[in-house]
Amino acid sequence: MAWPDTLPRRGLYLITPDRADSAALFAACEQVLAARPALLQYRNKSTDPALRLAQAHTLRALTRAAGVGLIINDDVALAEQVGADGVHLGRDDGDIAAARARLGEHAILGASCYDQLPLAHAAVAAGANYIAFGAVCPSTTKPNAVRAPLSLFADSAALGVPRVAIGGIT
């Protein structure tokens, strides 16, 4: 469950928008990867599995070339298929312990904890490498998302894992 030595534990964590236009997605990602973020999360809620697989494979190649970690949102099988560095799971997207068992101890596992410190404790106990709280700002992609108070970041420091602010940060 250790964090990979090849990836930074701090830095910018970018999340892709849902985009069916692969060329536009890849062009945007190439630009941001030049800035060397810590991680890039591929998030595409499309129901087209072929599109998601093709995009994820290309993003894996782009992130490898840039030395940036690739996290797949909500899809352990896709993360496994493309050799991603890990997966990010929301409350209804799968079990952290099951993902750890499937992806192994070197995978990066993240968990959405919304505005709930008990979820963060449970996620870390189940094997999460990082926790995410949010939305910290109003979000256009999830306009009804609950707002997470910034105090959660201090309150969760003792968990000893990186904490990520998500939601409405553009």
Name every feature range the model reports, one short phrase each.
Residues M1-I96, A101-N129, A145-A148, D155, ...:
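Conserved N-terminal beta1-alpha1 strand-loop-helix module at the mouth
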Residues I166:
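Short hydrophobic "strand-cap" motifs at the C-terminus of beta-strands
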